[in-house]
Amino acid sequence: KNEVSENHMTKLVILGRKSKTGNYEAFFRALPAQIVTTLVPGEVISCDALILPGGGDITPAFFGEKNKGSRTVDTELDILQFQALDIAIAAGIPVIGICKGMQVINVAFGGTITQDMPEDCLHSSPSGDVFHDTIMVDDSHLFKYFPVKMRVNSAHHQRIDRLGQHLKIIQVC
């Protein structure tokens, strides 16, 4: 994408349901940027970066499977996020995928998801999120911006199974 002028305020688009994106909005508001939460994929064309946030599970049909443990699927949101991702990729707009957003990116590039991990691998609890460490891969673009080891919250019962084409793992837990 072309260089942004000094007078231009960076615009970040969060493609998600406003009722479920408050934590993401609060985090990104710490940046000198305009934050727009929307369900309109076309908003992406005028932004500087697309954020695909966490949420429920991806509809398994999108990666060629029947439901074998996926919960809280939102097929309408999945479709909108895939459309926004297509627009961003075509326009050369950077994309950040967080939790489910990362899985959306993986599926869009032909990857698959483990729909329900074994209990000994879970990053969730009936009483709420679990906190655990993640490790940034040292040859990733983000390595220079973030600590190697980060503590994150999660409520995962899914994970990437087969990595999508042309994708690279940059953080592991």
Question: What is the meaning of each model-derived region?
Answer:
Residues 101:
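Conserved SAM-binding loop
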